[in-house]
């Protein structure tokens, strides 16, 4: 407790802070994830738009079913 109050909560010189992040790696990982999510989203949208199968079959609905 005296060590924390002596340096006001900061890390002492010579010791490595366990909460220090490598922001370059985090940034690259986030950009890769965002790019993959974008591509997967486009593939899903385009696969629903350009379906193979020709004409669409519409189901007839009776008034009783409404």
Swiss-Prot record:
InterPro entries: ATNG, FXYD_motif, Ion-transport_regulator_FXYD. The keyword Nucleotide-binding does not apply. Pfam families: ATP1G1_PLM_MAT8 (PF02038). GO terms for molecular function: ATPase activator activity; protein-macromolecule adaptor activity; sodium channel regulator activity. One of its GO terms (biological process) is positive regulation of sodium ion export across plasma membrane. The keyword Transcription regulation does not apply. Regulatory subunit of the sodium/potassium-transporting ATPase which is composed of a catalytic alpha subunit, an auxiliary non-catalytic beta subunit and an additional regulatory subunit. This is Sodium/potassium-transporting ATPase subunit gamma.
């Amino acid at each position: 407790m005296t060590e924390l109050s002596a340096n006001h909560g900061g890390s002492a010189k010579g010791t490595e802070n366990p909460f220090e992040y490598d922001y370059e790696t985090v940034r690259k990982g986030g950009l890769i994830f965002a790019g993959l999510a974008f591509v997967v989203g486009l593939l899903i949208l385009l696969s629903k738009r350009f379906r193979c199968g020709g004409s669409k079959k519409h189901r007839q609905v009776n008034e009783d079913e409404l």
